[in-house]
Regions:
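Alpha-helical structural segments
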Residues: 90-98, 145
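Alpha-helical bundle regulatory/interaction domains
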Residues: 1-71, 77-83, 100-125, 133-156
Length: 156
């Protein structure tokens, strides 16, 4: 993944900042109001909304929320019992697996791009580190598993 120059925000970070500002301007009720209750909830919201995109730098979110990164990390851990980095990885992996399960299969380069990787090999490395299989190998096995399950159900 290529690095952005310091001070340059990714599109996903700009969207998050605009959403934070819009929520503050008109907090309303319901889910929007609950997001503003704690910075940890807001961070989780953006991680989920971006599917764990690698271009979402959580320090940018912390700064916009007016808290130190370390404070946000502690708040997140206290509320969700895992670090933001762990949650971001978990979210990214789950989303990539869901895209790789689609039939016809989503191209690995498309999955990598959706998750913010500028270089497909970086996504492949991430995926293999998490699953011990390449994305294409995991996808093939998952499609075979799904097909065998469907074949079994049709015989029953």
């Amino acid at each position: 993944m290529s690095r952005r120059p310091a001070g340059t925000l990714s599109a996903i970070e700009n969207e998050a900042i605009q959403e934070i500002r819009a929520l503050r301007a008109s907090p309303g009720e319901g889910i929007h109001a609950s997001l503003l209750e704690t910075p940890a909830r807001m961070a989780r919201h953006f991680i989920l909304g971006s599917h764990g995109n690698v271009q979402l730098r959580l320090a940018t979110i912390a700064q916009e929320l007016g808290v130190e990164m370390r404070t946000l990390e502690r708040m997140f851990f206290d509320e969700y019992d895992q670090t933001m980095a762990e949650f971001q990885l978990e979210t990214r992996l789950a989303f990539s697996k869901s895209l790789l399960c689609i039939f016809p299969p989503t191209k690995i380069s498309a999955v990598a791009a959706i998750l913010g990787y500028n270089v497909v090999q970086d996504f492949n490395r991430f995926f293999k580190k998490q699953t011990h299989k390449s994305p294409s190998e995991w996808s093939r096995e998952e499609h075979a598993r799904i097909a065998s399950g469907e074949a079994q159900r049709s015989r029953d």
